[in-house]
């Protein structure tokens, strides 16, 4: 069903950043099943799943001993670390305190900021890229990790893909290198 949320996503993808399109990144979800709304509402959204520390899709039987699982399926684009991610936690009292940090940020909500940050790095290197180009760089630079079979799949234009892992684990170094090469080529520096 078409909603205000869908309209906002569509508008930002089409018109954000002066017409280049805003990079929209959503968490896949933590139900160990199919990606759900709103992450599955537009194929231009970059959908992020969570990896376990053992290089596999986070699932209830993965090595970390936690009982949740990253959602997966047709809409999944890439994976990022999603178990016990260190981060700040500024919900407590005013000012800095030792409890302002956590070592246990979990779920696809902890994986998603890795990809949003990678998109920011890509745009810092080349702010003229459209949202499709950023998504392509993120997908094509991803590492094929784990014992999964990645294959060319109809409807997945950025290379080898897997139903549980998408295009694989994000790789900031490869993404930065691809962005630099693309920038130099577009400026005529072959």
Annotated model-derived regions:
Residues 31-32, 52-55, 83-84, 123-128, ...:
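Acidic glycine-/aspartate-rich tracts in secreted/extracellular proteins
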Residues 53-110, 146:
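Catalytic-core environment of secreted peptidases
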């Amino acid at each position: 069903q078409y909603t205000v949320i869908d309209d906002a996503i569509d508008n930002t993808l089409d018109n954000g950043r002066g017409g280049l399109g805003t990079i929209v990144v959503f968490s896949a979800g933590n139900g160990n099943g199919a990606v759900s709304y709103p992450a599955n509402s537009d194929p231009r959204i970059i959908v992020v799943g969570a990896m376990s520390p053992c290089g596999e899709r986070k699932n209830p039987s993965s090595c970390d001993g936690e009982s949740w699982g990253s959602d997966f399926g047709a809409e999944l684009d890439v994976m990022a670390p999603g178990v016990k991610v260190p981060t700040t936690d500024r919900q407590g009292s005013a000012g800095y305190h030792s409890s302002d940090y956590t070592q246990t940020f979990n779920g696809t909500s902890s994986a998603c900021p890795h990809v949003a940050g990678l998109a920011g790095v890509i745009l810092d290197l080349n702010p003229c890229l459209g949202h499709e180009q950023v998504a392509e760089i993120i997908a094509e630079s991803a590492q094929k990790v784990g014992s999964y079979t990645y294959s060319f799949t109809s409807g997945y234009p950025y290379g080898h893909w897997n139903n549980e892992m998408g295009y694989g684990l994000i790789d900031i170094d490869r993404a930065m290198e691809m962005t630099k090469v693309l920038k130099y080529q577009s400026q005529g520096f072959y």
